Amino acid sequence: MKICLFFNTPSIYREAIYKMIDKEYDCDWFFGELSDDVKCLDIKCLKHSTILGIGNKGRRVYWTKGLISLLFKKKYKTYFMYGPTWDLSFWPFLIIKALFFRKKKLNIWVHGWYGKETWLEGILKKFMFHVVDGIFCYGDYAKKMLLEMGYSKDKVFAIHNSLNYDEQLTLRKKQHDTEVYKSHFHNENPTIIFLGRLTSIKRLDMILDAVSILKQNGQLFNIVYVGNGPMRDMLEHKAKVLCLSDQVWFYGACYDEEKNAELVYNADLCVAPGNVGLTAVHTMMFGCPVVTHDNFAYQMPEFEAVKPSKTGLFFDFGNVESLANQIANWFSQDNYKREAIRENCYMEVDTNWNPYYQIDIVKHNLKIAD
């Protein structure tokens, strides 16, 4: 029996799990028009795939052309799709399914519940969760909140997230200590890394402020920003104002994963003052722990990879003094051992944040029509 899958964008970071699903089931894939902002996979890597047009593309509220018609195709009795709150085609799809196609099974892959929803968002999400047969959340935090709201544990599952795990695992096995930072900074101070786009929502200026505070207290750290973005000029200026220029390396965007692996492996700590997202999975894959904020309603699901004192720490949301303290606390832990921390990070990703974990969740929990 065929399964109909629909996702808004064929994001390349999901290539591994999509291929596993494609191999496990007889799938027809549908995606929204390719996005200019997201790196997309070649959908030809999937057996049967189609791009659907988007109306009002690029706006918050839009619609997907042809989505509703998929519900009327007799060959589809099981659906697996994302749950787009602002896709105007999705809500008629849900209503028609609830009224006329109750025997068909609808599974959604969504963030779930944040805890910061507006009244309208809350109403829409609750209706969606009521109608669907299976809810695959990105993380256990959202799953826990939905269970507390009364949804059945037989309906809600944590599918987590992943990157190109197999390729990164091959690179991880090749890593060793190098002098990539010693040769650049000409010191042996601990190095803080951030890997990703330099955007305002990530509050990357807080790293500079925290390191400046620590410097005043006699604690010296290097910073490397691996990535480009609209905040780069501001960050470079701020580094000069704080007299940190010799401690900060603006490496720029790097699309060479082998080089990224070396930079992350040899760094001592990743600091993500804003939403951490897949940066946590990326850096832990190569053994680097993470410090990020503790306001989970405003986090991305991957914050769950941070296990205090094992794979990282949390600081008080928006509080630069707390961030500085947690950076210092990380390196002053009793029995601090860099290699043991690497192993903790490896175990977290190898256990919870990879496509093998994800396909296992799908195989055991996907609601399939008779």
Residue ranges of predicted features:
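Donor nucleotide-sugar binding/catalytic pocket of nucleotide-sugar-dependent glycosyltransferases
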Residues: 132-181, 187
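Conserved donor-binding/catalytic core segment of Leloir-type glycosyltransferases
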Residues: 182-202, 208-211
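Acidic donor-binding loop of glycosyltransferase active sites
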Residues: 262-275, 288-289
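Short hydrophobic beta-strand element within catalytic cores of glycosyltransferases
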Residues: 289-298
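A charged, aromatic-enriched C-terminal amphipathic alpha-helix characteristic of glycosyltransferases
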Residues: 332-366
